[in-house]
Amino acid sequence: MSDEQDKPTLSRKPLGLKRTVEAGQVQQQFSHGRRNTVVVEVKRRRVLGRPGEAAPTPEVEEAKAAPAPAPAPAAPRPAAPKPAAVDSLMTRQERQAQLLREAEEARMAALEENRRREEAERARAAEEERARAEKREEQAATKAPEPAPTPAASAPDATAADAPPAAEGPVETAARPATASAAPAPRRFTPVEALKRPEPKRPEPKASRGGENRRQSGKLTVTRALNEDEGARARSLAALKRAREKEKRSHMTSSGPREKQVREVVVPDTITVQELANRMAEKGADLVKALFKMGMPVTVNQTIDQDTAELLVTEFGHEIKRVSEADIDIRHDEDVDDAAQLKPRAPVVTIMGHVDHGKTSLLDALRGANVQAGEAGGITQHIGAYQVKAKDGSVITFLDTPGHEAFTEMRQRGANVTDIVILVVAADDGLKPQSIEAINHAKAAGVPIIVAINKVDKEGANPQRVRERLLEHELVVEEMGGDVQNVEVSALKKTGLDKLLDAIALQAEIMELKANPDRAAEGTVIEAKLDKGRGPVATILVRRGTLKVGDIFVCGAESGRVRALVDDHGKQVKQATPSMPVEVLGLGGVPMAGDTLIVVENEARAREVAAYRQEQALKKRTAQAPVSLEGMFSALADKANVIEYPVVIKGDVQGSVEAIVNALNKLSTDEIRVRVLHAGAGAITESDVTLAASTRAPIIGFNVRPNAKAREIANREKVRFLYYDVIYHLTADVAKEMAGELGPERIENVVGRAEVKDVFPAGKRDKAAGLLVLEGSIRKGLHARLTRDDVIVSATTIASLRRFKDDVAEVRAGLECGVVLADTNDIKPGDHLEVFEVELRERTL
């Protein structure tokens, strides 16, 4: 084309695109007679070049016919440039640039192919030369040495090996001008004809080196976008990995049958068939078939026992390892320390006795503190742990237990964790029920007892009477020839305290108390509570080992990490040694008093043990004894006859809540019983109020108060709060409320008895009975029971009372009278009438 032909010329016809799309309509038919009309368009694209013209034959064939000195593979035919589709939107310059790029890409691909072929030839020649040299050395070693012919024979081979690379240079140089002269040269461009390549697909486009506008070459045109899929796509990494895995599997299968892998299968008490198959790396269907052969028709989701699982594991050639759920738990009692690692520890002393006998006052005198003043009502309602340093520098740990009857479990807990029990008995009061209970707790725990006779300075004190009363409970003091130490003390005057400390030191020396501090810590929960600012807090008495900040532990059904340790003086410490009481912060929840704290290796182990214990506790709560039909009906009858008194209990510490629940359960009778909906330590929350509102139950708060949100809900739902700080005030008020639920007590007082002598009509419907009064008197309006042969016929009242024909109010014994009974006419001669009056009294529990 010339420039004049390329110039656009104006015509009188309107500008526009020729129609290249032919449209038609096709009807799609579906089921049930449905049809859909679809418009189909057929696009036509113009092709550059004449329809019958063949592609120009490149002159590279002449170069290809040149003799090659080496048997190199034939060069691939140069691909003729594909007639590019002419787009009406492309200009002539863009079409020429596209042709030039395609030619340049073909030329670069041919050069790259020639370079790779040359490298392969050189490598093959070098390998052949190396093989020939090794062969010559082997021949020289076996035969007689002939040095002259060997280099001469190898010279032609070396020359022949070096010849092919040198001969390929002229071929390539000859091919380049031939390729350049064969391509049709457009105006101001000299495209190069590409060598034919063996692969039919076009390679990835590469940037040309010159002669082209680079800014325009990188632009995305319509033609490039439409022909994008014609280029070769590289395989993704995922496809390569899949191919390698497939090849590896094919090699493994082709190598022969694989040897069966024997596994150690861990089998718990019960396991499903599918889970067992997964652990053995077998198919679940194979296990089901094996069980069917054993006569057990099961599915993969059914559970089998450990013995059946062992048969399956053995049959499939694996090894079994039996485990039990109980193995998850920690058995601290089986871990015994070596005697060489034990070191002396401080004695743990529990002070026990009856209420108001001066236990806390005695401990205050020993500590030099005033704990008793902080207790509500002057009585101890919490179990406290303290350490006292004696004059010789030794340390003694004291546990102060409540003396009230409601705190039985607290006293029992204190006796179980202690080494020595100090029984405090008031000299003027003697032994009381809780004193005797403390003696029984100490005997059950196998703990030695030291008797402290307190209040010897008070008038009416008689210590000798206390010693004599102790003989009734098999406690023989030293003054009477026994082995039980007793000390007369006065907490008020602080007399006899040194003797008491000496007695404790002597008893501890006899017992030789030791523990291993260089091991994981173990301790017992003395008390637990939910603090508003600190969260769950537990008072722990360390039994052995050393508890440190950061230790991970399990405490009952709760787990956690030690965030802080606080001693009995309120100071934070870094660690707690054996026999040391500390407050532990960092629990996941409030544990139960009496639980054991054990330090474990990691959090996963702690959570596993805690979850197992929670599951066991849930099973224990929800487990029910086998119920018979008779038992079911009797339970329903009891439930219908017994009134329930629901309560929600919140206390400051777990021990107090436990004591309140036990005290309220003792108030239950055959007619009414306490139903504890929820009992826990901590402040009264919104959930507590919501629970109480749903059942119309009062909320009992022991040394706790509700938050603002809970008070708001309580005012809206009309929920009652009962606040207490002394436990016997709480039990007294609850007993009154339970009695009020029952209503007044109905008491019957028999007034008189009479015998029916005759029956005669009285009016149209009623019958009158002629009576002889045998005992007491009969009055009008009283309640009466008519009996026949000692069987009650009717319960009624006396509607009318007459003597002869006169109405009277009362008839005494020995006289005859006539009565009309209300609501009954079933009266016969010989019946007996019992007259009584009803008295309503206020109930007491």
From Swiss-Prot:
Gene Ontology CC terms: cytosol
Name this polypeptide is given: Translation initiation factor IF-2
InterPro entries xref list: EF-G-like_DII, IF2_assoc_dom_bac, IF2_II, IF2_N, P-loop_NTPase, Small_GTP-bd, T_Tr_GTP-bd_dom, TF_IF2_bacterial-like
Single GO MF descriptor: translation initiation factor activity
Compositionally biased residues, Basic and acidic residues: 101-140, 194-215
Pfam families assigned: EF-G_D2, GTP_EFTU, IF-2, IF2_assoc, IF2_N
Positions of region (G2): 378-382
